[in-house]
Amino acid sequence: MYPRFLSRNYPLAKHLFFVTRYSFGLLGLRFGKEQSWLHLLWLVFNFVNLAHCCQAEFVFGWSHLRTSPVDAMDAFCPLACSFTTLFKLGWMWWRRQEVADLMDRIRLLIGEQEKREDSRRKVAQRSYYLMVTRCGMLVFTLGSITTGAFVLRSLWEMWVRRHQEFKFDMPFRMLFHDFAHRMPWFPVFYLYSTWSGQVTVYAFAGTDGFFFGFTLYMAFLLQALRYDIQDALKPIRDPSLRESKICCQRLADIVDRHNEIEKIVKEFSGIMAAPTFVHFVSASLVIATSVIDILLYSGYNIIRYVVYTFTVSSAIFLYCYGGTEMSTESLSLGEAAYSSAWYTWDRETRRRVFLIILRAQRPITVRVPFFAPSLPVFTSVIKFTGSIVALAKTIL
């Protein structure tokens, strides 16, 4: 038995921003719907839970920084991811109405393409939709496995020390008030700490899924524009005045839709620039500290950080892949126009084609401070983390 969204019979319309809606829905944040008091209270609890556990991780790491740097690193590594996720959760709630409006506009634009009854568009749409949902849920699943790995580590350590004096340790390296590390409150705070790991997973999977989904949905709309350019500029020998006029109108519609896509991407950049920048910076540090922890630890402790590193790397890869896919499809508009039979049309049509080619030379990208997410940026991030690890090895 596997999840319904993996089935080929699952309605295509439900795939649109599925990961974002599902992940944030688990936290009580609903986009485009009226927020009930129950959902709002659940959202506030999750936010406070994550903030409180971030503070507990920081206290643990700071208190062990001089006496046990290895344990301090074990606390600071998840803390970087948790604190970033806390920022993302607050940011997405603050911009929730803009996010909902953006989702509705994309739904309308894609709905216009669905009315075309074009097999090429249907195949491309299904391909992009399934990729967004499956890759987003892959990160969601990997994050849950990471939380499970930390919990299993904690339970295993309890089992190994069962004949010794019992240590009331949390699944993550957290230091609460003294009563939380004693019975009868210990089981409650143990679950409280574990849940903060899942809040982290749901929030970062929802935010990352929103970015990845948006870029691939835009890539689909740009691909649909490419099909329209190819259809509008089909080779016709001696086109009539009426045919030239129709072609010019179709090209004008293509330009308008291209402008609309660029406008939406600009608005999206305004919403996601801050969380994306913070994510890339923190992900670089998290990957580096995870690799350092792998070098410092031995035995079963390595497994959880291998999974953790793979999860964070997968999330940042989706950002970069989505940005590259969108910019590539944007550049392909100019290639499609140039490869068409534009030379057989009249002067006005050729002029419009020339303008499309010039416009397409400037790719559409999500603007983030200092960079635009792309596969070369992913390579740079990995190199940067490698430099941090090399520096840490010389110090440690």
Swiss-Prot record:
Its main location: membrane. The chain crosses the membrane at residues 40-60, 74-94, 136-156, 201-221, 277-297, 302-322, 370-390. It is a multi-pass membrane protein. Keywords: Cell membrane, Membrane, Olfaction, Receptor, Sensory transduction, Transducer, Transmembrane, Transmembrane helix. Residues 1-39, 95-135, 222-276, 323-369 are cytoplasmic. GO terms for cellular component: cation channel complex; dendrite membrane; plasma membrane. The keyword Amino-acid biosynthesis does not apply. It is found in: Cell membrane. GO terms for molecular function: ionotropic olfactory receptor activity; odorant binding; olfactory receptor activity. Residues 61-73, 157-200, 298-301, 391-396 are extracellular. One of its GO terms (biological process) is detection of chemical stimulus involved in sensory perception of smell. The keyword Hydrolase does not apply. Interacts with Orco. Complexes exist early in the endomembrane system in olfactory sensory neurons (OSNs), coupling these complexes to the conserved ciliary trafficking pathway. Odorant receptor which mediates acceptance or avoidance behavior, depending on its substrates. The odorant receptor repertoire encodes a large collection of odor stimuli that vary widely in identity, intensity, and duration. May form a complex with Orco to form odorant-sensing units, providing sensitive and prolonged odorant signaling and calcium permeability. Involved in the behavioral responses to anisole. Belongs to the insect chemoreceptor superfamily. Heteromeric odorant receptor channel (TC 1.A.69) family. Or1a subfamily. The atypical heteromeric and topological design of the odorant receptors appears to be an insect-specific solution for odor recognition, making the OR/Orco complex an attractive target for the development of highly selective insect repellents to disrupt olfactory-mediated host-seeking behaviors of insect disease vectors. Odor-evoked OR currents are independent of known G-protein-coupled second messenger pathways. This is Odorant receptor 45b. It comes from Drosophila melanogaster (Fruit fly).
